[in-house]
Curated annotation (Swiss-Prot):
UniProt record similarity statement: Belongs to the 2-oxoacid dehydrogenase family.
Domain Lipoyl-binding: 73-148
Region (Disordered) residue spans: 163-216
Name of the molecule in the record: Dihydrolipoyllysine-residue succinyltransferase component of 2-oxoglutarate dehydrogenase complex, mitochondrial
InterPro entries, A to Z: 2-oxoA_DH_lipoyl-BS, 2-oxoacid_dehydrogenase, 2-oxoacid_DH_actylTfrase, Biotin_lipoyl, CAT-like_dom_sf, Single_hybrid_motif, SucB
GO cellular component: mitochondrion; oxoglutarate dehydrogenase complex
Role according to the record: The 2-oxoglutarate dehydrogenase complex catalyzes the overall conversion of 2-oxoglutarate to succinyl-CoA and CO(2). It contains multiple copies of three enzymatic components: 2-oxoglutarate dehydrogenase (E1), dihydrolipoamide succinyltransferase (E2) and lipoamide dehydrogenase (E3).
Biased composition (Low complexity): 163-210
Residues annotated as the enzyme's active site: 410, 414
Residue stretch of the organelle transit peptide: 1-47
Keywords from the named record: Acyltransferase, Lipoyl, Mitochondrion, Transferase, Transit peptide, Tricarboxylic acid cycle
GO terms, molecular function: dihydrolipoyllysine-residue succinyltransferase activity
Biological process annotations from GO: L-lysine catabolic process to acetyl-CoA via saccharopine; tricarboxylic acid cycle
Length: 439
């Protein structure tokens, strides 16, 4: 009798345990926690066996855990793109969800105020999630995309299909002889219909009268900076004319030898950079900038050179011009221009300038007033070289003349300093030997 009673109690206990397990599992399923069910059932099977055998039912010992993602998933965040840049715009995703990606392969491109940056994959795997769409702004430090780590199989080699043999031409079938039937009589000619009179009504185009194109981020930033420059600086422009005869003769005489020795062509821009560097050293206020109530004098001469690029005008910087030779400057101009044309300029290539040179003459501009590139205090404008009448020793002669324009911030640069600066550039370029002698 006692054995039967004990058996009944054990059966009731086991039924209670089974009932609790079913209720717990149902609750988990209703909460869509499949991972929890797997964890619950797999890791606790041995515990339940011991629990059933020992008739020890205690629901408080059951723990639930929730898993949100795999340990193999890597979330890539928007990287730092420079001290002054906090956000950018997604211009293109080169990979979509489900695509395989290898280490260092480009996944997307982000356009900033200055340059476009390619974002590479840090690991190999599969793209499982994109956190932004093309055209959306993203902030530095925010989630950009997610990769499930894994080996990516090499692309199979595709053999070129063998050329199929041309089918043999079939033997020509002899044409059947024409049946001997009487020819039909020719139909009577009908009179040509009278042409309808042409309509005099003119049709108007029903197409759209305008086309809207969203400004690129770099164009928006350029517009904002130029407007800020106009609103902040007290801009004034002074002009002078430059006789290019001596510089053009020097270039004509030494250009082949220069290119043979240094591997780069002898251009006019390097001469203007050297002349500007000499003038900036003599007039350091032109190389300065305004920060609140302070005037900041820059000890190094870092000159931005305006370059036309596919996305618009960019101004990469040539650093430490005071330490560079003609050849060094030409090589740096060539390197930066190539990067600009290929839309491959880095952030470091465009920041830290103290003075800017813009050459509108390459587009045929005769005259213009450039706008200061903030936070700088001055900009030099070059223009087209044209043969013009010029007075030399009391005689009118024809000389290749370029008009120079210097726009400066009148808050810190006086007219005397600006005119003296521009005249120094004129004197150096009209007497190129001054560059060699640093006079």
């Amino acid at each position: 009798m006692r054995s039967a009673t004990k058996l009944i109690k054990n059966v009731n206990i086991n039924r209670c345990v089974q009932s609790n397990v079913v209720r717990s599992t149902s609750r988990l399923i209703n909460n869509n926690s499949i991972n929890t069910v797997r964890q619950f059932t797999s890791s606790s099977s041995s515990s339940f066996t011991s629990l059933f055998n020992n008739n020890n039912v205690n629901n408080t010992n059951i723990k639930y855990q929730r898993f949100y993602s795999s340990a193999n998933d890597v979330v890539i965040k928007v990287p730092s793109m420079g001290d002054s840049i906090s956000e950018g715009t997604i211009v293109a995703w080169t990979k979509n969800v489900g695509d395989s990606v290898r280490v260092d392969e480009v996944v997307c491109s982000i356009e900033t105020d200055k340059v476009t940056i390619d974002i590479n994959a840090p690991v190999s795997g599969t793209i499982v999630e994109l956190f932004a769409k093309e055209g959306e702004n993203v902030t530095v430090g925010n989630d950009l995309y997610k990769i499930a780590k894994g080996e990516v199989a090499a692309a199979p080699k595709v053999e070129a299909p063998k050329a199929a043999e041309a089918p043999k031409a079939a033997a020509p079938t002899p044409a059947p002889k024409a049946a001997e039937t009487p020819k039909a009589a020719p139909a009577p000619k009908s009179e040509a219909p009278t042409p309808a009179p042409k309509s005099t009504t003119t049709t108007t185009s029903t197409g759209p009268s305008e086309t809207r194109v969203k400004m690129t981020r770099i164009r928006q930033r350029t517009a904002q900076r130029l407007k800020d420059s106009q609103n902040t600086a007290a801009m004034l422009t002074t002009f002078n004319e430059l006789d290019m005869s001596a510089l053009m003769n020097m270039r004509k005489t030494y250009k082949d030898e220069f290119e043979k020795k240094h591997g780069v062509k002898f251009g006019f821009m390097s001469a203007f950079v050297k002349a500007s560097t000499i003038a900036l050293k003599e007039q350091p206020i032109v190389n300065a900038s305004v920060e609140e109530n302070d005037i900041v004098y820059h000890n190094n001469v870092n000159i931005n050179v305006a370059v036309s690029a596919p996305r618009g005008l960019v101004v990469p910087v040539i650093r430490n011009c005071e330490n560079l030779s003609f050849a060094d400057i030409e090589k740096e101009i060539g390197r930066l221009s190539g990067l600009a044309r290929n839309d491959a300029l880095a952030i470091e290539d465009s920041i830290g300038g103290t003075f800017t040179i813009s050459n509108g003459g390459v587009f045929g501009s005769m005259f213009g007033t450039p706008i200061i590139n903030p936070p700088q205090s001055a900009i030099l404008g070059m223009h087209a070289i044209k043969d013009r009448p010029y007075v030399v020793n009391g005689q009118v002669v024809v000389r290749p003349i370029m008009y120079l324009a210097l726009t400066y911030d009148h808050r810190i640069i006086d007219g005397r300093e600006a005119v003296t600066f521009l005249k120094k550039i004129k004197d150096v370029l009209e007497n190129p030997e001054r560059i060699l002698l640093e006079l």
